[in-house]
Amino acid sequence: MEKEKLTDVPLHQIQIKDAFWDKYIRLVKDVILPYQWNTLNDNVKDAAPSHCIKNFKIAAGEAEGDFEGAVFQDTDVAKWLEAVAFTLDSSGRDEKLEKLADETIDLIGKAQCEDGYLNTYFTIKEPDRRWTNLKEGHELYTAGHMIEAAAAYYNATGKRKFLDIVSRFADLICETFGPEEGKCHGYPGHPEIELAPVSYTHLRAHETG
């Protein structure tokens, strides 16, 4: 017997009208995302500096300094962008929020290396040690969050820039890892990259028909 095939329902086709959930949906859009944006930019007085946006500015050549934060610090920016994407997709477009996201994506593009590599820690601090510590370096974990965020943002806005950025990074990862001779035969110490290409491939499949 043939099994029924399940398909995702796009967020913009779902309407939640509920006194309990409406309150939290508005809270995310109006309070949490702006607060997180200020935190990423080190503008929250009582919060420890995250250095997230600053690291990207340094990698992009727009600021001077050393990398600060955890080796996976870039993922906070990716998670914020993904949350923005889901909000835009489910609650409708918001010009101010979308502008902040677009500017952040522009910065990420400037921080990307010529070969497609994207990771501010290794770009700034240890450029010669890419892919040398897959267990603790979190490069593929970070890449996974970037790819997922880009897929969500493309789905919400139809804008390709972020998707094109991570496509270059995904191509580099495919060129670097694999069973073939001369490629890296390793796997990450933290899961995330495994889920990301599913979202990416799903979008690409729709593009190509």
Task: Enumerate the language-model features and the residues they cover.
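Low-complexity, Ser/Thr/Pro/Gly-enriched N-terminal "stalk/linker" regions
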Residues: M1-D76, D102-E103, L107-F122
